[in-house]
């Protein structure tokens, strides 16, 4: 006889996309027929056969502290901003629940690739002394979930399914 899973609920959501910095603006832009696709002009994209992509603008990260911007990968930063939106939306339903009864489950394809790329360049161009000592904590796949749990004070665990 199968064990019945514990009930769970999604009570908030967030998004940071090329179309908008929150779910409402993203949905409105989508409904208005806007496209988040643009020309790629970054140095790293010059050798790519594809010259377009959907990029979240750097301005989307401005609300994060400079310290957090230096000590976390863009992947974790975007996850944190979206999680803050979801947390705000869910707050009326989660008030009074002990933090140890709330968990973060945040999936990622691979984690901090921009950190891996940047630090590889530091290593090859400047040697081992130029590599950021926070490289590993910044690039591991579970960094976004951990950052969200720390930021929101969630104590029930931080889990990262990785494809």
Residues covered by each model-derived region:
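Conserved "HGTGT" condensation-loop signature of ketosynthase/thiolase-family condensing enzymes
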Residues: 1-157
